[in-house]
Amino acid sequence: IVVDALHFHRSRVKLEELESLPKEWFRFMHLCYAFQEIPTDLDVLVHDGREERLYPGEGAIDLKGILSKLPENIVRGIEIPHSVRTAEIGFEAHARRALEYAKKYLE
Protein backbone atom coordinates (compact mmCIF):
# COMPACT_ATOMS: atom_id res chain seq x y z
CA ILE A 1 0.00 0.00 0.00
CA VAL A 2 1.18 3.51 -0.84
CA VAL A 3 0.24 6.15 1.70
CA ASP A 4 -0.09 9.58 0.09
CA ALA A 5 -0.18 12.22 2.82
CA LEU A 6 -2.54 14.49 0.89
CA HIS A 7 -5.11 11.78 0.23
CA PHE A 8 -4.72 10.40 3.75
CA HIS A 9 -5.58 13.85 5.12
CA ARG A 10 -8.44 14.46 2.71
CA SER A 11 -9.97 11.05 3.44
CA ARG A 12 -10.01 11.91 7.14
CA VAL A 13 -8.28 8.63 7.96
CA LYS A 14 -7.33 8.33 11.63
CA LEU A 15 -3.84 7.30 12.69
CA GLU A 16 -5.37 4.43 14.64
CA GLU A 17 -6.68 3.00 11.37
CA LEU A 18 -3.10 2.53 10.15
CA GLU A 19 -2.34 0.52 13.29
CA SER A 20 -5.12 -1.93 12.45
CA LEU A 21 -3.35 -3.07 9.28
CA PRO A 22 -0.23 -5.26 9.04
CA LYS A 23 2.88 -3.06 8.75
CA GLU A 24 4.28 -5.25 5.98
CA TRP A 25 1.48 -4.05 3.71
CA PHE A 26 3.04 -0.58 3.60
CA ARG A 27 5.90 -0.04 1.17
CA PHE A 28 5.89 3.63 0.15
CA MET A 29 4.91 7.05 1.51
CA HIS A 30 4.35 10.24 -0.50
CA LEU A 31 5.44 13.21 1.60
CA CYS A 32 3.70 16.54 1.09
CA TYR A 33 1.64 19.07 2.95
CA ALA A 34 -1.75 20.65 2.40
CA PHE A 35 -3.99 23.21 3.99
CA GLN A 36 -6.11 22.13 6.96
CA GLU A 37 -9.35 22.91 5.17
CA ILE A 38 -10.40 20.17 2.76
CA PRO A 39 -11.95 21.66 -0.39
CA THR A 40 -15.44 20.50 -1.30
CA ASP A 41 -15.22 21.62 -4.92
CA LEU A 42 -13.85 18.88 -7.23
CA ASP A 43 -11.94 21.35 -9.42
CA VAL A 44 -10.20 22.81 -6.37
CA LEU A 45 -9.38 19.31 -5.06
CA VAL A 46 -7.79 18.38 -8.38
CA HIS A 47 -5.95 21.69 -8.70
CA ASP A 48 -4.48 21.52 -5.19
CA GLY A 49 -3.39 17.91 -5.62
CA ARG A 50 -1.74 18.46 -9.00
CA GLU A 51 -0.47 22.03 -8.75
CA GLU A 52 -0.36 23.37 -5.20
CA ARG A 53 1.00 20.90 -2.68
CA LEU A 54 2.96 22.49 0.13
CA TYR A 55 6.41 21.80 1.54
CA PRO A 56 6.59 19.77 4.77
CA GLY A 57 5.94 22.09 7.68
CA GLU A 58 3.82 24.59 5.74
CA GLY A 59 0.44 22.97 6.17
CA ALA A 60 -1.66 20.85 8.46
CA ILE A 61 -0.83 17.20 7.79
CA ASP A 62 0.66 15.21 10.67
CA LEU A 63 3.48 13.58 8.68
CA LYS A 64 5.37 12.55 11.79
CA GLY A 65 2.25 10.93 13.20
CA ILE A 66 1.60 9.03 9.98
CA LEU A 67 5.22 7.90 9.72
CA SER A 68 5.18 6.73 13.34
CA LYS A 69 2.51 4.17 12.40
CA LEU A 70 4.39 2.86 9.35
CA PRO A 71 7.48 0.64 9.09
CA GLU A 72 10.70 2.53 9.80
CA ASN A 73 12.24 1.35 6.52
CA ILE A 74 9.36 2.54 4.34
CA VAL A 75 10.45 4.31 1.15
CA ARG A 76 9.63 8.01 1.35
CA GLY A 77 9.14 10.05 -1.77
CA ILE A 78 8.59 13.79 -1.94
CA GLU A 79 5.56 14.58 -4.07
CA ILE A 80 5.11 18.33 -4.13
CA PRO A 81 3.94 19.61 -7.51
CA HIS A 82 3.46 23.38 -7.36
CA SER A 83 2.99 25.24 -10.64
CA VAL A 84 3.49 28.76 -9.26
CA ARG A 85 6.71 27.93 -7.43
CA THR A 86 8.21 26.07 -10.36
CA ALA A 87 7.35 28.99 -12.64
CA GLU A 88 9.01 31.42 -10.21
CA ILE A 89 12.15 29.51 -9.24
CA GLY A 90 12.40 26.63 -11.72
CA PHE A 91 12.07 22.89 -11.31
CA GLU A 92 15.54 22.24 -9.90
CA ALA A 93 15.32 24.95 -7.23
CA HIS A 94 11.83 23.76 -6.29
CA ALA A 95 13.06 20.17 -5.96
CA ARG A 96 16.02 21.26 -3.84
CA ARG A 97 13.80 23.37 -1.60
CA ALA A 98 11.32 20.48 -1.20
CA LEU A 99 14.17 18.21 -0.10
CA GLU A 100 15.48 20.83 2.36
CA TYR A 101 12.05 21.28 3.91
CA ALA A 102 11.50 17.53 4.17
CA LYS A 103 14.88 16.97 5.82
CA LYS A 104 14.36 19.82 8.27
CA TYR A 105 10.84 18.68 9.16
CA LEU A 106 11.81 15.04 9.66
CA GLU A 107 14.90 15.72 11.82
Q: For each of these PLM feature ranges, what is it?
A:
Residues V2-V3, F8-E107:
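Histidine-acidic metal/acid-base catalytic patches
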